[in-house]
């Protein structure tokens, strides 16, 4: 893989925090941390009509949210690839919804899910499939 070298400036406190993290985790390559962080930042800030993949992570009270959750999932079934459902307790569930579609539509789906009564957490993790060069 060809690479470009760049130089960056960090506030001292952020630099110290980074160095402490690298030592604690035994990370041999500082560049890899920046590559991952930059890809994540770029993914989160892509245009709204690009096709992306993602996971919507939900934590919810199934007694309050299940019916509305199912309705919205059926409304967006063209964007939903798969779901994984976990029972955490008698009341609380976690759901991971794998999605693909235009970013703006997936953000809209995540926002709608987050408005359902009983949803405690709704978070869209965006992934853009990078080709290794």
Curated annotation (Swiss-Prot):
The processes (GO biological process) annotated in the record are: regulation of DNA-templated transcription; response to nickel cation
InterPro entries recorded: Acetolactate_synth/TF_NikR_C (IPR027271), ACT-like_dom_sf (IPR045865), Arc_rbn_hlx_hlx (IPR013321), CopG (IPR002145), CopG/NikR_regulator (IPR050192), Ni_resp_reg_NikR (IPR022988), Ribbon_hlx_hlx (IPR010985), TF_NikR_Ni-bd_C (IPR014864)
Q: Which GO terms describe its molecular function?
A: DNA binding; DNA-binding transcription factor activity; nickel cation binding
Q: Which domain of life is it from?
A: Archaea
Annotated binding of Ni(2+), by residue: 74, 85, 87, 93
Query: What does the note under cofactor report?
Result: Binds 1 nickel ion per subunit.
So what family is this one in?
Belongs to the transcriptional regulatory CopG/NikR family.
What protein am I looking at? Putative nickel-responsive regulator
């Amino acid at each position: 893989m060809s690479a470009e070298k760049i130089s960056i400036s960090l506030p001292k406190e952020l630099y110290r925090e980074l160095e402490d993290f690298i030592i604690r985790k035994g990370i041999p390559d500082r560049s890899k941390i920046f590559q991952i962080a930059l890809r994540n930042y770029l993914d989160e800030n892509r245009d709204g009509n690009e096709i992306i993949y993602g996971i919507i992570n939900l934590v919810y009270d199934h007694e309050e949210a299940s019916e509305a959750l199912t309705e919205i999932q059926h409304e967006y079934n063209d964007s939903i690839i798969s779901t994984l459902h976990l029972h955490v307790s008698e009341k609380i569930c976690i759901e991971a919804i794998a999605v693909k579609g235009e970013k703006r539509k997936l953000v809209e789906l995540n926002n709608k899910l987050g408005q359902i009564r009983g949803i405690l957490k709704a978070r869209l993790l965006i992934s853009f499939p990078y080709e290794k060069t």
